[in-house]
Amino acid sequence: MLVRAVVVSFMLAMIGISSAAVAAPARPAVQVSMDDYFGDWQGTATAMSETDEDFPTSKRDIALTITKSDIGGFLVSWSTLQRQKGNPKAPLEVLKSTTVEFVPAIVPNTWKAKAEVDPYNGGILYWARLDGSGLVISSFTINGDGKPEYQTYRRRISGKDMRLEFSNVTDGKFVRTVKGALKKLRSR
């Protein structure tokens, strides 16, 4: 019975549902709109690695811009200044940036990346949804060694504050989680 509970919890975590959410009584959903997300955001986060012995935790600086597109979608650009390589006492700073344009999908409040990609050839498949848990952007790719990689960025807002939760699962194993807070600098 315990094994079954662990397996169910893991499967729910893989699709982004906590066991508390399944067991909790329904609460009225806070109405959020994509308009609330449009703008420039900046903040910090802490990354926790399940696989990196030299950097089990590390700090990151985050910049995020979300702008409305003229076709009912949006453009999201984020940059992360990571400190998780080199000497743990003096880590190297590595800037990683990503920009993805999303267009409406068939289901309301869902979007898919405008660019058509093939995850079998190293392309990253992106999709997004807006629901009671916030703006969730997910990605999937197949690494060069054939192992699947699934990433989820969950962004929740309250006024000018944003909470970020990120998870990276490779070949069924949690590699890294990131939690952070951002402030809205300006609306777009």
Each model region followed by its residue ranges:
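N-terminal helix-cap/turn-to-beta initiation motif at the start of protein domains
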Residues: 25-42
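Sec/Tat signal peptide C-region and signal peptidase I cleavage site
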Residues: 19-23
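Positively charged n-region of N-terminal signal peptides that target proteins for export
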Residues: 1-5
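Edge beta-strand at a domain terminus
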Residues: 24-26, 149-188
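Bacterial N-terminal signal peptides
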Residues: 6-17
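One face of beta-strands
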Residues: 39-45, 60-62, 162-164, 178
